[in-house]
Structure formats: C-alpha cells, structure tokens
Design a protein with these regions (language model features):
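Small/polar, glycine/serine/threonine/aspartate-rich low-complexity segments that form flexible
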Residues: 24-29, 76-116, 120, 295-327
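Bacterial Sec-dependent N-terminal signal peptides
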Residues: 1-34, 424, 430-431, 435-441
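Amphipathic alpha-helical coiled-coil segments and their boundaries
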Residues: 37, 44, 51, 120, ...
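Sec/SRP-type N-terminal targeting helices
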Residues: 49-53, 66-67, 122-149, 199, ...
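Periplasmic alpha-helical coiled-coil/stalk elements that build and connect Gram-negative outer-membrane
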Residues: 24, 32, 36, 60, ...
C-alpha cells in the first residue's frame, strides 16, 4: 500500500510537470499595434535575411574587384635537371681550328632557382569597369533589400488589419446569431400556439443558418490571415499571435493624404539600368590594350651533382623587369556579338525603367484617389450600419409585441445585414489602401 501511494504521487507529479512544460513551450507573441508587427517581421523574416546576405556578398565582391590596383607577389623555387645540355655551333678559331665550326655544349647538369615575382597591372580598362559594376551591384543589393522591406511592411499591415477586422466581424456575427436564435425560438413558440405557420419557422431557421455560414467563412479568413502573418513574421505554427488592438466600431478620424513616399522599387530599376550601361561599356573595353609589368628578383645555383649549398658564394643573382602590352587583334565575332547583346540588354533596362516610372505615377495617383473615396464611403456606410442596427432592434421589439409580422422583421434584418456587409467591406478596403500608404511613408 505504501509503495502504491508513492507511485501514484510520482505519477501525479509527472503529469503536473508535463502540463507546465507544455504551457511554457507554447510561445505567445503579443501585437499591440501594426507597428509592433512590422518591427517584429523586419527582425525575423527569413526572406529578408537572404536579402541581407546578398548585401554582404555584393559588398565582398566589390572589395575583391578593387584588388586589381594592387600587385600580385609570389615566391617560387625550382630545380632543373639538364638531361642533355644544349649544343651551340661556334667558330673553330676559338678552339684552334680555323676555318671549321665546332659543336660545343655549355652549362651544368643541375640548375637551382629561387626568387620572388611581382606582377602589376599598369592599365586595364576591363578591370576598372568591373570595379564600377561591382560598386553599382553593391548599391543595387541594398536597394533591393529596401524594396523588399517596403513590400514586407505592406504585407504585414494588410494581413494584420484583415485579422483584426475579421475578429470584429466575428463579434458582430455572434451578436447577429444570438438575435437569429432568439427569433427562431420566438417563432417556434408562436408556431406551437398556432400563431404562425411552418414557413415562418423555416425562414427563421434559414436566417440562423446563413449567419452561421458567415461565421465559419470569417473564421477561415481569420485563420488564413494569422497563418500568413506567422509566415512573414518568421514564427512557427505552434507560436500564437495575440492581437491587443481592436477596430473601433465608431468612426475614426481618417485624414486624407495628398502624396506618397518614393517607391523604392523605382530605385531598383534605376540601378539595373546603370548596371546594364556599365556592362555595355565592359564589352567595349575588350577591344582596348592591357599594359602589365613583371619584376623578378632571384638567385641561381649551377652544379654538376644533385647536392645543394646555401652559403652566399654558391648563388648568383638573377633579376629582370618585363613590360608587356596585349592588344586584341581578332577574336572572331565574339566581341561584336557581345556588344550587340549588351546594347539590347541596356535598351531593355531603360525601357523597363521608363515604363515603371509611368505606371508608378499612375498607380500612386489612383491609390490616393481610391483611399480618399474609400474614406468618404466608409463614413456613409458606417452611418447606415448604425441606423439599420437601431431599426433591427426596434423591429425585434415590435415583432415580440406582435405589432409587425415576421416577414416585416426579416426585411429590416436583411437591410441590416446588407449595411453590415457594406460597412465591413468599406473598412477592409480603407485599411488595405492604408497598408500601402503605411509602407511608403
């Protein structure tokens, strides 16, 4: 009995600890406002981390491109075995044989070389242009990161506002369902008393079912919005989001906006065009000469055996300075075709930039107009929503008192649902425009 009690106690303790561990393992992220959600996403979005790594890569490539201005220095050592010494034809007078030629061999079988070689590019137009391209690509990577951050802010704001508006819609739906259930109960009671027919009961039940369908649809929309937020905020599915901000049912003081901040996507197109122009210049520099210089300083040792001595008297100095110029004469039609391709790419980049500037200007103007219209529209539909809500409550009281029929009440309730839908849609549209404005300011 004593052993059983101890075992039972340990079992209970294990269950309590497991429960506590499960609670701790569920992480909760509280969102006080849309700014909180945006800041969290900017710190934890996995795709943004890739853009930052691309920035580091471009910066590293730019540093590498500047190395052409520095000399390349290398040390070398070699051992040469002359299996057959070279033969030189000399006049016989040297050997006391006038009028004849003598084949003579000079040198020793083993030669040892050790020295340092320094090579420096004096003038290389291709390397200079590649450095400029790397510099532009570094700036381009930074601008691409900024453009992605702008899009990320817009997505976070859009899903955030969709979530809190849908939560508000669910609260309204639940209130509507409560009223619909009350109508169904009241109609069923009247049916039992013979005051209404089965058709009225069916109408009341259909009305309640329709509202339940709206609730389920909004639950799906809320789950989708939360799921998208979790993804772009870098959260796991087990980590919960808590929205501490709610959409106010009363009208907010919305302000018109006359201008938008600069679209960072345009900067990306501008630098893509710059990069294409530099690439065209790079292809043209392939025709230009290259000037290089090489300096070698070393020592040699000649021997008839394989041994090697390290005293200073055993070595002789050997140094040289080498200047070279490399001029492309004929490379087939490769360079010509590369230049033509680069010209086409540059024209494409220029056209894309011009088109994007025109489209952005038009879209920005349309966005500001739509935002202004949506604010005006939201004010009107909110007033209609509040008025039809009052009419719905009055009609319910009149139906309870038998002053109006169920059909008359349903007509009022239908007007209320239409006004509710219009208000929620207007709220959603206004916040969707505001999400874009927020990302640009």
């Amino acid at each position: 009995m004593k052993f059983s009690a101890i075992y039972y106690g340990l079992f209970i303790l294990q269950g309590v600890l497991s429960s506590l561990y499960a609670q701790d393992s569920l992480s909760t992220v509280k969102l006080q406002s849309v700014s909180t959600a945006i800041d969290y996403a900017l710190k934890n979005n996995p795709d943004l981390n890739i853009y930052l790594l691309q920035q580091d890569k471009a910066n590293s490539e730019f540093k590498t491109s500047k190395n052409y201005m520095l000399p390349e220095v290398s040390a070398s050592a070699s051992r040469q075995i002359n299996i057959n010494l070279p033969t030189t034809i000399l006049p016989g007078e040297i050997f006391g044989q006038p009028g004849e030629t003598v084949a003579a061999q000079f040198g020793q079988k083993y030669t040892f070389n050790a020295g340092v070689t320094a090579t420096k590019s004096i003038l290389d137009w291709q390397a200079k242009t590649q450095k400029k391209i790397a510099e532009v690509n570094k700036e381009l990577a930074t601008l691409q990161t900024g453009a992605f951050e702008q899009k990320l802010k817009e997505q976070v704001a859009l899903y955030y506002y969709t979530a809190i508006i849908t939560k508000k819609a669910l609260n309204i739906n639940k209130s509507d369902l409560h009223v619909a259930d009350s109508i169904l109960l009241l109609t069923s009671q009247k049916f039992e008393k013979g005051l209404v027919d089965q058709f009225a009961v069916n109408q009341a039940e259909i009305n309640a079912n329709n509202i339940e369908q709206n609730i389920n649809a909004n639950k799906i929309l809320l789950a989708q919005s939360v799921n998208q937020l979790q993804i772009i905020m870098g959260l796991k599915s087990a980590e919960q989001l808590v929205f501490e901000e709610e959409v106010e049912t009363k009208l907010k003081d919305w302000k018109y906006q006359s201008e938008l901040g600069y679209d960072k996507n345009l900067s990306v197109y501008e630098y893509q065009f710059k990069s294409s122009e530099l690439n065209l210049k790079l292809q043209k520099t392939a025709k230009l000469p290259k000037f290089n210089t090489t300096f070698y300083w070393g020592q040699q040792q000649f021997r008839d055996d394989f041994a090697l001595e390290f005293d200073s008297g055993s070595w002789t100095d050997y140094s040289y300075l080498f200047l070279s110029i490399n001029v492309p004469v004929f490379t087939g039609f490769r360079n010509k075709n590369k230049i033509k391709t680069a010209q086409i790419e540059s024209e494409i980049a220029r056209t894309n930039l011009l088109n994007e500037q025109i489209k952005t200007e038009a879209k920005d103007e349309l966005l500001l107009n739509e935002y202004r219209f949506s604010v005006d529209n939201m004010q009107a539909v909110y007033e209609n929503f509040m008025l039809t809500s009052q009419n719905k409550d009055l009609s319910f009281e009149q139906y309870e008192q038998g002053i109006i029929s169920l059909d008359q009440y349903f007509k009022t309730f239908e007007d209320y649902l239409k006004a509710e839908s219009a208000y929620l849609n207007a709220l959603s549209n206004t916040y969707s425009y505001y999400a874009t404005l927020l990302s640009r300011n």
